[in-house]
Amino acid sequence: MELPFAESWKIKMVEPIRKSTRKEREKWIKEAHYNVFQLKAEQVYIDLLTDSGTNAMSDRQWAGMMIGDESYAGATSFFKMKEMINRLTGFEYVLPTHQGRAAENVLFSCLVKEGDYIPGNSHFDTTKGHIESRKAFAVDCTVDEAKNTQLEVPFKGNVDPDKLDKFLSEKADKVPFVIVTITNNTAGGQPVSMKNLRQVRNIANKYHKPVLFDSARFAENAYFIKIREKGYENKTIKEICREMFSYADGMTMSAKKDAVVNMGGFIATNIQDWYDRAKVFGIVYEGYITYGGMNGRDMNAVAIGLDENTEFDNLETRIKQIQYLAQRLDEFNIPYQRPAGGHAIFIDAPKVLTHVPKEEFPAQTLTIELYLEAGIRGCEIGYLLADRDPVTRQNRFGGNDFLRLAIPRRVYTNNHMDVIA
């Protein structure tokens, strides 16, 4: 007999949350200048601002934190984390940082210079920010299918090989590396196929360019490859991860996502020159090379979290909750980026608020209205986040305008999903 689906964990600790009145929320959002980031946590009922660092850790992770080695140099906790990263990725050199954007800052400080171009798939805002703050340019080569939110294709996060090849044929001398974000957050938490990773690798090789992965949600990407890509259905998540990273020369990682911790990140690579140059900036910005802004206890938790969250059952539980919320939204005919992504539901705000012109930022408007109605805090991923063009200073309206509902791992139940829907 096949049992019905149920979560692959049980709950050991809970935290109370409280509802508020609409009158209270109207006062609070006004005091926050209609910026949900300015709200206090206790003013939020269900917090879907991000899945970064907001997850519930496992008992093994908490146990690991109790025996963290806090030595300034050569901490055993660092070597535990490094060994796990080596096993999952094949990357030899590991440089810890306090979170993902710090990893970008350290690595880009030695790789990106004024006038450079960094092609990739829908660079996230911090990635784009670190590129543009150095007077370089982020070039989006995402497949066009990602712009059509109602189109059901399995890998809407892919890099368009033709776009990438054409751009490199014209600007290769100005490109320090190609970046691939797995999963593609800005496009709706959409995965990148293994076939596409191979294509990117081959095109990069053609122009003698290294490939960097923004790997915050690499385990969720591996899950989608196992579920959706022919030939991988019998592979383990760890086997899929190892193959994914074989097509890259390095990675930046926010461990606050798929390592299921509250704080942490790292750079990993097989290019010794990258490591040697990044070490200098790492020491200046983050700390010594065996802690990089992280406590030993946090490095223990990262090592354990990477191991646990590259198991199928853990990922299946997580992604089925996202899919449950998507099914509930379907009942109410709410348009979102289809199919549902790995870490969030991305509501297509202009299709919901058809009367709000793009100049008045539909996704930001919908974000505020959702908070006022139910005390739920989402996040705009769209025209505001895209910022103005650094050269023309005009708003960038070319992409999607989403209200992102990011679901923290192992935090909320499906009853909460019902409230959200």
Please tell me what each predicted stretch does:
Residues 256-257, 359-369, 373-374:
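Phosphate/diphosphate-binding loops
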Residues 322-323, 337-349:
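Conserved glycine-rich beta-strand-loop-beta hairpin in the small C-terminal domain of fold type I
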Residues 262-264, 342, 400-404:
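Short, solvent-exposed beta-strand edge segments and adjacent coil->beta transition regions
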